[in-house]
């Protein structure tokens, strides 16, 4: 197990080129796999989760070549996937498992089993199994279909309407991928807020999809070769950038710039929260790349204040909440996080693990059923912490070590490889000692 020790640097300075966005990297592989033609994806995230997606798609007969962060996908068309000869191992990636389940569900006659590591096998899957079954899909798994391994038997899918009970981009995307193979349009209503990368990419690939929030309607393509391949450069991942934003805001002598960040409005919740907390943030060089808005974000040392994070903001920053909780511990006043019960079913129970780690650092934190209450202003002290195999926690505790007095020791530091393999190298470069 990788152990890493961190002590506070004198200052933080640097310009950081971010790894490609994790959500977009996943979707670029999956959607181009069923396109008619070849696509090139640059700045692809080479973290373990996205590599799991590549491996699973290759097992479905799709030819993929990767050189560093450049990936070429030769699409097989909507009906050209091949039945896998072995179990599809999704590793730690919920996105891989859930979106693939939607895609395979519409491959009539195909049989596949989707599984993953112990963490993924414990995460709830009924959230995709139930709506996919409503479209005519055949899925089953442990605990009445709630846990992987999931067995998926491709079937004739129907259109119709479905109301999403939770704001989950993975659930929404699984249904939209399944709808590509349906016999009639699919209309989604309810909690369709959250990341909209799938909708943007499908539209760019020629799929008839309309979004009139909260209503999304997708009409299945008439032909198996109807999807145009979509070459793109994955913009910088705002969920990874958020660690540097918080680091700069809470360190007493810091200025960090993250370049080429995805500024999709469904992904900028962390920026909005930090602005509300009083962070000094400057966004420059805003532009459109492909179907996504991007820009450069500079954050400087700031005096933060406590806020309430709740409601519609939560889906826009769900992955950034652990590091925002750290920012709250360094702020003046009380921060309340609520409506974030989804944190309970991430790679770890992030409410429990984040609260425990912050408490070990000297913060005053009260976990609740759907969030936590953080009393800011405490002087953090170094501690021995554990990532519990969770990449977001590993990076959160690393950032804490930049401001906590003494030495912070992190067990399971290698978990960062899931989404940000270069993290430790960047940290060493920007921390001036």
From Swiss-Prot:
This is 3-phosphoshikimate 1-carboxyvinyltransferase. InterPro entries: Enolpyruvate_Tfrase_dom (IPR001986), Enolpyruvate_Tfrase_sf (IPR036968), EPSP_synthase (IPR006264), EPSP_synthase_CS (IPR023193), RNA3'P_cycl/enolpyr_Trfase_a/b (IPR013792). Belongs to the EPSP synthase family. It comes from the Bacteria. Catalyzes the transfer of the enolpyruvyl moiety of phosphoenolpyruvate (PEP) to the 5-hydroxyl of shikimate-3-phosphate (S3P) to produce enolpyruvyl shikimate-3-phosphate and inorganic phosphate. The active site is at 319 (proton acceptor). Its EC number is 2.5.1.19. It comes from Roseiflexus sp. (strain RS-1). Monomer.
